[in-house]
Amino acid sequence: MNIVYHSSNSFVPVLGVSIVSILQNNRETEIINVYIIENRWTEDNKRLMEALVGKYSNANLYFIPMPNMNEDYRLGLKQIKSIWLFDSYSRLFLGSILSENVDRVLYLDCDTLCNGSLREFYDTDFEDNYAAGVIDCLSDPYYELFDMDKNSRYCNSGMLLFNLKKWRDDNMEKTVADYVRSKNGYVFFMEQSVVNILLQNKIKIVHPRYNTYTLMVAFSHDNLRRLRHCTRYYTDSEIDEAVNNPVIIHLTNGFYVKGRPWIEGNRHPFRNLFMKYRALTPWKDEPLFPDKSNWKQKAVTAFVKILPQSVMCSIVGWVYNVWRPNHIRKSMK
């Protein structure tokens, strides 16, 4: 089993929690190869991660220096926001970053937790698809914004099982690079939109239990529909199954949930599970990350809690699904 992450040095304590949750829940797997595409890690953090993974006899750890995604692949990426890192594009170049003998790999964002065996999912039959993933909750205006056809499904790129053999055989890295250059280095939602646009109808859709993200837990079915106007999505029963028995949990950010589990004062629904696995890492005694929310973000969080959730979702839903796509379209011209 091959697992790959990318991480900066500052996020190592969070990544450690994700890795230990996988190793704890997959002891029956013969071999787990953990690849970390690292961006300027300290030697101390590398040693601590080696010590963590070294406790599991079925696990191997490999560090790979993060390429300069812009220069090495000549993508011409534009820095629209200072917080955006081009490192996230590395998941679309795993065919060349990882060795040729890796023909299947599970890519995970660092903000994920494993809550069960990955074996069944990892062995998914690709059926000539490039990847397997979980649908993100987006409305039709976003599909139109990205010129995606009516049969396509937009997946969250924080968890993707890649068919690297097909990826390499079809020279998808060139396709990705050519597309990004054709957009002058700017694609909204970055690599997530790139992979969805280029792999339309070639991502195998799997059960949401393999990427149970915060939205699924924070809102009722009706309020989620009010908030996101999503029509190309899972059934209510599938979402219930994912929330009640998730295998991969994605600790995504959200305006309605205060903080994420590694932030001081957070109220995330999976904070206790996160802390359970954090206690098994070398970073267990380090303080949680400080809350860096500015006053506007704190005001929004407080305001939306005052309104009935259904009313709040209707208001925010109009902004997110009507005003925002039009604003994005103008910015892309």
Language model feature labels by segment:
Residues 51-96:
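Active-site-proximal specificity loops/subdomain of glycosyltransferases
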Residues 40-47, 141:
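Short, charged/polar "capping" segments at the starts of alpha-helices
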Residues 159-171:
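Conserved nucleotide-sugar donor-binding
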Residues 67-69, 87-139, 152-154, 161-162:
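GT-A fold catalytic core of metal-dependent nucleotide-sugar glycosyltransferases
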Residues 32-40, 133-134:
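Short internal beta-strands
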Residues 7, 169-333:
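A glycosyltransferase accessory/donor-loop signature
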Residues 21-30:
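Short, acidic, metal-binding catalytic loop of nucleotide-sugar glycosyltransferases
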Residues 7-13:
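Active-site beta-to-alpha loop of glycosyltransferases that engages the nucleotide-sugar donor
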